[in-house]
């Protein structure tokens, strides 16, 4: 069974549904459970017993989230024995759990929140700094879907950077001793012309 942790507020945002859809395309018979982030606790995850855990993107800037409601997910990020993959805002959530900073890529106009912020969006090139692990079997430069205004500003302790591009420096990272991975892009939004995201998900599911 696969667990998707839904990081959206009030169900705004399509990331959890898109991750589920991609996983069902890869394995039509797979069992998937989606749980709201505020309902996550170590005990609940232990009862569910997933083989892999996915952290979805978020729908609002992280400062609008109640820290107490994120505590359960942070505990899972730090201690879960299962492989964990944070997608887009899920990578940022991993960074926050380990004390790193998340902020806008750049502000290019007036406004508050995401208004006036630089957004990386569309199929973009990302340069891999490793072709092992979840990036096994891929070329040194991949094409994946991006849609974000925030980014991880500094690597958390015990993490290494595994991908980059010119717009947003930390495009992927992984823990040095635990199976915890983050990608700033959306591997679930793959198609026949852009298959690299599918390979990433397939590699993760083999861990």
Q: Where do the protein language model's features map onto the residues?
A:
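Short, charged N-terminal beta->alpha structural module
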Residues: 2-27
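Short beta-strand segments
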Residues: 4-6, 34, 146-147, 184
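Cofactor-binding loop segments of dinucleotide-utilizing enzymes, especially the Rossmann-like FAD-
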Residues: 5-7, 37, 89
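Acyltransferase
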Residues: 8-11, 183-207
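Glycine-rich nucleotide phosphate-binding loop and flanking beta-alpha elements
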Residues: 11, 60-62, 91, 152-153, ...
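Alpha-helical elements of Rossmann-like donor-binding domains used by nucleotide-donor carbohydrate transfer enzymes
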Residues: 18, 72-75, 160, 199-203
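Flexible gly/pro-rich beta->alpha loop and the following alpha-helix that scaffold active-site loops
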Residues: 20-86, 98
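Pocket-forming structural segment of enzyme catalytic cores
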Residues: 83-85, 96-195
């Amino acid at each position: 069974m696969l667990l998707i942790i839904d990081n959206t507020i009030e169900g705004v945002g399509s990331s959890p549904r898109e991750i589920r859809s991609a996983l069902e395309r890869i394995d039509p018979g797979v069992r998937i459970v989606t749980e709201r982030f505020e309902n996550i606790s170590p005990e609940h995850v232990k009862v569910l017993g997933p083989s892999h855990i996915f952290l979805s993107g978020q729908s609002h800037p992280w400062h609008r989230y109640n820290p107490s409601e994120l505590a359960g997910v942070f505990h899972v990020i730090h201690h879960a024995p299962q492989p964990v993959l944070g997608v887009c805002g899920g990578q940022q959530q991993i960074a926050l759990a380990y004390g790193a900073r998340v902020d806008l890529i750049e502000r290019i106009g007036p406004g508050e929140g995401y208004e006036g912020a630089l957004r990386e969006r569309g199929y973009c090139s990302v340069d891999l700094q490793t072709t092992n692990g979840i990036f096994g079997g891929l070329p040194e430069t991949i094409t994946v879907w991006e849609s974000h205004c925030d980014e991880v500003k500094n690597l958390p302790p015990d993490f290494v950077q595994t991908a980059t591009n010119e717009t947003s420096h930390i495009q992927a990272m992984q823990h040095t001793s635990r199976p915890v991975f983050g990608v700033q892009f959306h591997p679930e939004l793959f198609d026949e012309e852009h298959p690299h995201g599918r390979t990433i998900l397939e590699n993760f599911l083999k861990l």
